[in-house]
Regions:
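N-terminal Lys/Arg-rich, disordered targeting/topogenic segments
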Residues: 1-8
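Hydrophobic membrane-insertion alpha-helices, especially the h-region
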Residues: 12-27
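A phosphate-binding catalytic loop at a beta-strand-loop-alpha-helix junction
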Residues: 109-128
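Cysteine-based protein phosphatase catalytic domain of the PTP/DSP
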Residues: 32-113, 132-167
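Generic alpha-helix initiation/capping and coil-helix boundary signal
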Residues: 12-13, 121, 135
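Intrinsically disordered, low-complexity segments enriched in polar/charged small residues
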Residues: 14, 127, 152-155
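Positively charged, low-complexity intrinsically disordered regions
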Residues: 9-10, 140
């Protein structure tokens, strides 16, 4: 390595430059680590699936809330259809109502956000039922598609059974 004879003159400048670079890198990394990603996923244009968040996704005009508690959201159309993430599963009539709400809102051109507490089980079940009906897909293909958009989707076993009943009823 070639070192200039007067390297001691440049040493403070080099040290300050390296320190400044380290500070910038640390701040950028800390910002990325601490910035929370939104707890929702775009399933397709105009259709979001997720968990509870302080604000619904951008441009959202309709919310279907499956949580046991109501939301503070102020959107054009809001439906609260609380269910527990446990057995027994709701019945097919309840599921038809939720799918009809999504269909109605999408037909009106509204962006729809379907959510439960974590965006995993209840909302995954309802979104799967909607897609199964619209696309005429079987349950497993629909869940595979949903997981490609939101990997954490895992409906409760009772909800999986309800989706099989839904598949056979359509």
């Amino acid at each position: 390595m070639i070192v200039p004879k007067n390297w001691r003159r440049f040493w403070p400048v080099a040290a300050i430059t390296v320190a400044a670079i380290v500070v910038v890198v640390v701040h950028v990394a800390a910002d990325r680590i601490t910035r929370e990603a939104p707890n929702y996923s775009l399933i397709e244009d105009g259709l979001w699936l997720g968990g509870f968040v302080p604000e619904p996704p951008p441009g959202c005009g309709a919310v279907l809330n499956l949580c046991e508690s109501e939301d503070p959201y102020h959107v054009g159309s809001y439906k609260w259809a609380p269910i527990r993430d446990a057995e027994p599963a709701p019945d097919l009539d309840w599921l038809r109502e939720q799918v009809a709400f999504i269909e109605s809102e999408r037909s009106a051109g509204r962006v729809v956000f379907v959510h439960c507490r974590n965006g995993v089980s209840r909302s995954g079940m309802v979104m799967a039922a909607y897609l199964m009906k619209r696309e005429h897909w079987p349950r497993d293909k629909t869940l595979e598609f949903l997981r490609s958009r939101r990997p954490g989707v895992r409906p409760h076993p009772a909800f999986l059974q309800l989706l099989l009943e839904w598949e056979h009823s359509h």
